[in-house]
């Protein structure tokens, strides 16, 4: 199942997560993929965005298998900076999102590809079940009117794809480390070139990858490029820097919740303050988990394992 919803407004966050939990009850063994639009740091539509987002993340951590994080502000930035659009409309933002969605799901829709289903993708990208919030990127970035005419080389595509300015959520991957990542190229190309490129990227930026997950960048090839482009690539990264986003929402949440601002809207509909406290602590746990794995080193991992073994023997 794929669900597209926003976490700022009432319908996307409330109805969206309710739908997800009902589907989860009904079809517990099916994969649940969400494309979630998080509230932006500067552009705010409603006052209670932090509440809605925190309550939604609380649900998404439990009920979604894979969550692609999108962000209106990051999309606006891409439109301004990269596409040089002066007044981007929602149509332009949707164009970027649809390109990414098409890239993420291309291995499901076209026959004979590696990573041919969501489950396989999830296995590759999720080292710990709670940490399933991914940043997505797309290259080459084009506006709706001008599909690019020059074709890019594989190294250029790769470079554009890993560029932090291309990420569709407001977190900078350079502030954290990648646990895992996946790159999907859409063109007839040799996998050997591709793997070389990926190894290159990893060697150059080795400090941005955790060393305790070897071979953590997977690449796949799909022969059929998207309409109007000769080649394209989609990037999905599980980076610890996404905690910036959760931390920001959490701070806004705490600032409002401490004063119990606007709470009556929720309690009037039959919600309990306890649910808010729970959602807040779940979000904070998520942030600290990301931080823990960002700081973890290979030696520490071995140390933990030794401790666990000793405990097991002690029992």
UniProtKB/Swiss-Prot annotation:
Principal subcellular localization: cytoplasm
Domain of life of the source: Eukaryota
GO cellular component, one term: microtubule
Record: residues binding GTP: 6, 10-12, 72, 94
Gene: TUBB1
Quaternary structure, from the entry: Dimer of alpha and beta chains. A typical microtubule is a hollow water-filled tube with an outer diameter of 25 nm and an inner diameter of 15 nM. Alpha-beta heterodimers associate head-to-tail to form protofilaments running lengthwise along the microtubule wall with the beta-tubulin subunit facing the microtubule plus end conferring a structural polarity. Microtubules usually have 13 protofilaments but different protofilament numbers can be found in some organisms and specialized cells.
Region (Disordered): 295-315
Location of the protein in the cell: Cytoplasm, Cytoskeleton
Taxonomic placement: Eukaryota, Viridiplantae, Streptophyta, Embryophyta, Tracheophyta
GO BP annotation list: microtubule-based process
Ranges of compositional bias, category Acidic residues: 297-315
A Pfam family that the UniProt record links to this protein: Tubulin
Protein's UniProt keywords contain Isomerase: no
Molecular function terms from GO: GTP binding; GTPase activity; structural constituent of cytoskeleton
Cofactor field: Mg(2+)
Keywords: Cytoplasm, Cytoskeleton, GTP-binding, Microtubule, Nucleotide-binding
Family: Belongs to the tubulin family.
UniProt name for this protein: Tubulin beta-1 chain
InterPro entries, alphabetized: Beta_tubulin, Tub_FtsZ_C, Tubulin, Tubulin/FtsZ-like_C, Tubulin/FtsZ_2-layer-sand-dom, Tubulin/FtsZ_GTPase_sf, Tubulin_C, Tubulin_CS
Function: Tubulin is the major constituent of microtubules, a cylinder consisting of laterally associated linear protofilaments composed of alpha- and beta-tubulin heterodimers. Microtubules grow by the addition of GTP-tubulin dimers to the microtubule end, where a stabilizing cap forms. Below the cap, tubulin dimers are in GDP-bound state, owing to GTPase activity of alpha-tubulin.
């Amino acid at each position: 199942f794929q669900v597209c919803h926003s976490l700022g407004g009432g319908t996307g966050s409330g109805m969206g997560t309710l739908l997800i939990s009902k589907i989860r009850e009904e079809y517990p063994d099916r994969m649940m993929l969400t494309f979630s639009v998080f509230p932006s740091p500067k552009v705010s539509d409603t006052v209670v965005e932090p509440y809605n987002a925190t309550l939604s993340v609380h649900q998404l951590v439990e009920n979604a298998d894979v969550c692609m994080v999108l962000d209106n502000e990051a999309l606006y930035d891409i439109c301004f900076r990269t596409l040089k659009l002066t007044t981007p409309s929602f149509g332009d933002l949707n164009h970027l999102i649809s390109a990414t969605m098409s890239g993420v799901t291309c291995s499901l829709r076209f026959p004979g590809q590696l990573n041919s289903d969501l489950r396989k993708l999830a296995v590759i990208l999720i080292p710990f079940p709670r940490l399933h919030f991914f940043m997505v990127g797309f290259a080459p970035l084009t506006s709706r009117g001008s599909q690019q005419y020059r074709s890019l080389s594989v190294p250029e595509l790769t470079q554009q794809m890993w560029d932090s300015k291309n990420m569709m959520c407001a977190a900078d991957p350079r502030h954290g480390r990648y646990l895992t990542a996946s790159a999907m190229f859409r063109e007839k190309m040799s996998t050997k070139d591709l793997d070389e490129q990926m190894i290159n990227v990893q060697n150059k930026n080795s400090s941005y990858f955790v060393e305790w997950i070897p071979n953590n960048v997977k690449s796949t090839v799909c022969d059929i490029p998207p309409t109007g482009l000769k080649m394209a690539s989609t990037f999905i990264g599980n980076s610890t820097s996404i905690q910036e986003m959760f931390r920001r929402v959490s701070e806004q949440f705490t600032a409002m919740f401490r004063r119990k601002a606007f709470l009556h809207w929720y309690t009037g509909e039959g919600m309990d303050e306890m649910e808010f406290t729970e959602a807040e602590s779940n979000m904070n746990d998520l942030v600290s988990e990301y931080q823990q794995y960002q700081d973890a080193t290979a030696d520490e991992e071995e140390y933990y394992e030794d401790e666990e073994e000793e405990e097991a023997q002690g029992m």
